[in-house]
UniProtKB/Swiss-Prot annotation:
UniProt-annotated glycosylation sites, renumbered to this chain: 63, 66, 132, 198, 283, 369, 534, 629, 679
Record bears the keyword Signal: yes
Reported tissue expression: Expressed in a gradient in the developing limb bud epithelium during Ti pioneer axon outgrowth.
Bias-annotated ranges (Polar residues): 673-685
Organism of provenance: Schistocerca gregaria
Entry-linked SMART domains: Sema
Protein name: Semaphorin-2A
Source superkingdom: Eukaryota
Residues annotated as domain Sema: 21-493
Length: 697
């Protein structure tokens, strides 16, 4: 009976739990916070060793080496909102909506000046300041600065994007490109370029350009996530209601839009609007006969000095949650913009590709020296046909990585080149922030056949439980910078020694290598063990924990490789194998009366006998995690030979248990008597009492 009860308890304890996220070592983290300030905008300037953070009524300048050394007052610029009363009178909250949330920080020229735009109590306003966060001198007036409408949002909760472009604009004059809401009511969303001024004379040379107002074919309730200056174009990434799907129901698609930097609009048609605006769908999906789409882009990153764009996408937040990382090339994007256009003949018609014979010349959307010279046929076509028929395919035809029950919010990417046994390996490392304040670290490489492969290397907390609102990476300072509404954290990219205690995990991190001499994880240098691609099954075998145990007959024992299984390994198949002289090698099949799997993928052996002797190996795929050599000592506790022996042992156990119960009751009775005497004693006045009752008549 007791044995059955013990087995049931073990079974209950073996219920599978989700793998744990191991906390980062404190030496890997620096942090900065001045309270609940909504830190949502980053601009990183390695030249000035600074991370600029846009927050509530403030811009902070943090030390890139160690953000903890920064001071809330000394290293900040205060930009108080104006006309708060008017904002409150419109039904907005004084403590959040009617503050000045800084949403744009962009370098101007060589970076010695910064362009800043904030919500300013639902009345957007912009500034130009020095990079040391001091205001310009009075004589350094910058024309066109002061009103931030269409440059950053009214509502601090609205998504927006902006990029300052120095070169390639009309007259080669600098200006801001933005994607945001341009009205208090949010009815007018816009992709916008500011008026272009000659900064020497202060004269306006070119008027602003924008998307067509209130036209769902151009923009339909977009959420902007990024914008980039790329050659003769500016690219915008966003998600919006899919106008081409509206007849079948409401759905959201991810988009990339393109405008030419030299665009000055049309002469009579589209005179204030873009004459080169095009947009296309971004395809991030799991391939198959019926592809599974991650339709909603949440964040985008362009790796410096490359033509690659990396995005995090999610399923609809109203359904089952899932997220994916997909990559796109500029070449694939441009090919779609050079392809067929899409149109809807009538409001009830299906959206179909436009026949090539109906596309005017010069081709709509192509960059020309002067868009005012474009014929009306081209301008009318672009006005009614901004959408391309094809979708931009993701690299490799599949996501880099995808995961259910996770919402990715931000993404940054690093590239590593490693000399591995005379062979140069290139790894792309993705850091994806989540809505619960974690970062997923994924590594990608190309196999010998040129096919992309990826592996989840680590998961760690950065801002739990709050979402990661901003994320940036510095190769020079070897740090990852993440922000939530409450805190900014800096995490070292190379976290080997403080992160991995075993060879298996260490060897899978492209920044790290296992030192067999010191039996520790170090920053990778040639000669250390590394196996990111998981092709060397026996690489870590010499470092595997191997133990010898001598157990007595009838004893139950626990074999395990981890105190806590890292979450990155929790979803992988971990198996146990038993080696004996008689049976050879055979896999352990779990059953409640003999072999029980623990929540950390350990193994419990119930009531061992001679046949349980031998070696027990724990495997993760083709990698050995740990090994135990078990010897059953039958001399110290021999097996009962007959049923009478079992009955005698059981009877002895029952008598012992009964004696223990009697002893416990005796102790409880005496304890109660002592308590009663103590209470009676405390009620009497002691002659040495310092305080006593002495009522005054």
């Amino acid at each position: 009976m007791a044995a059955k009860l013990w087995n049931l308890l073990l079974v209950a304890a073996s219920v599978h739990l989700v793998g744990s996220v191991e906390q980062l070592h404190q030496d890997l983290i620096h942090e900065f916070s001045c309270g609940h300030k909504y830190y949502r905008t980053f601009h990183l300037d390695e030249k000035r060793e600074s991370l600029y953070v846009g927050a509530l009524d403030k811009v902070y300048k943090l030390n890139l080496t160690n953000i903890s050394l920064s001071d809330c007052e000394r290293d900040s610029l205060t930009l108080e909102p104006t006309n708060i009363a008017n904002c409150v009178s419109k039904g907005k909250s004084a403590d959040f909506d009617c503050k000045n949330h800084i949403r744009v920080i962009q370098p101007m020229g060589d970076g010695s000046r910064l362009y800043i735009c904030g919500t300013n109590a639902h009345s957007p306003k912009d500034w130009v300041v020095y990079s040391n966060l001091t205001h310009l001198q009075r004589h350094e007036y910058v024309p066109g600065i002061g009103v931030g409408i269409a440059k950053c949002p009214f509502d601090p909760e609205d998504s927006s994007t902006a990029v300052w472009v120095e070169n390639g604009n009309p007259g080669d004059l600098p200006g801001l490109y933005s994607g945001t809401n341009a009205e208090f009511t949010k009815a007018d969303t816009v992709i916008f370029r500011t008026d272009l001024y000659n900064l020497t004379t202060g004269r306006r040379e070119y008027s602003f350009k924008r998307t067509l107002k209130y036209d769902s074919k151009w923009l339909d309730n977009p959420n902007f996530v990024g914008s980039f200056d790329v050659g003769e174009y500016v690219l915008f990434f966003f998600r919006e209601t899919a106008v081409e799907y509206i007849n079948c129901g409401k759905s959201v698609y991810s988009r990339v839009a393109r405008v030419c930097k030299k665009d000055v609009g049309g002469k009579n048609i589209l005179s204030q609007n873009w004459a080169t605006f095009l947009k296309a769908r971004l395809n991030c999906s799991i391939p198959g006969e019926f592809p599974f789409y991650f339709n909603e882009i949440q964040g985008v990153y362009k790796m410096p000095n490359t033509d690659k764009f990396f995005g995090v996408f999610s399923t609809s937040v109203t359904g089952l949650t899932g997220s994916a990382i997909c990559s796109f090339t500029l070449k694939d994007i441009q090919e779609v913009f050079s392809g067929k256009f899409k149109e809807q003949a009538t409001s009830s018609s299906a959206w179909l590709p436009v026949l090539p014979s109906r596309v005017p010349d010069p081709r709509p959307g192509e960059c020309v020296n002067d868009t005012e010279l474009l014929p009306d046929t081209v301008l009318n076509f672009i006005r009614s046909h901004p959408l391309m028929d094809g979708a931009v395919s993701h690299e490799g035809g599949k996501p880099v990585f995808y995961k259910r029950d996770v919402l990715f919010t931000q993404l940054v990417v690093d590239k590593l080149k490693v000399n591995l046994v005379g062979k140069n390996m290139e790894y792309i490392v993705y850091y994806a922030g989540t809505s619960t304040g974690q970062v997923y670290k994924v590594v990608q490489w190309y196999d010998s056949g040129g096919l992309p492969q990826s592996l989840l290397v680590d998961i760690f907390d950065v801002t739990p439980p709050e979402p990661v609102q901003a994320l940036h990476l510095s190769k020079e300072y070897k740090s990852l910078y993440a922000a939530s509404d409450n805190i900014v954290r800096q995490i070292e990219l190379v976290m080997c020694h403080h992160r991995y205690s075993n060879c298996l995990q260490c060897a899978r991190d492209p920044y790290c290598g296992w030192d067999r001499d010191s039996n520790s994880c170090k920053s990778y240098t040639p000669g250390l063990l590394q196996d990111v691609t998981n092709t060397s099954a026996n690489l870590c075998e010499h470092s595997v924990m191997k133990k010898k145990l001598i157990v007595t007959w009838g004893q139950s024992i626990h074999l395990g490789c981890f105190l806590k299984v890292p979450e990155v390994l929790s979803s992988q198949t971990i198996s146990w194998v038993h080696y004996t002289k008689d049976k050879g090698r055979y896999p352990i099949v779990y059953r409640p009366d003999k072999y029980i799997e623990t929540s950390e993928h350990g193994l419990v052996l119930i009531s061992v006998t001679d046949s349980d002797s031998g070696r027990y190996d724990c495997w993760l795929g083709g990698s050995l995690l740990c090994s135990y050599n078990i010897t059953v000592d039958a001399h110290r506790c021999s097996a009962p030979g007959r049923s009478n022996d079992y009955q005698k042992i059981y009877s002895d156990w029952c008598h012992e248990f009964e004696r223990s119960k009697i002893a416990m009751k005796t102790w409880e009775r005496k304890q109660a008597q002592c308590s009663t005497k103590q209470n009676n004693s405390n009620q009497k006045t002691h002659p040495n009492d310092i305080f006593h009752s002495n009522p005054v008549a």
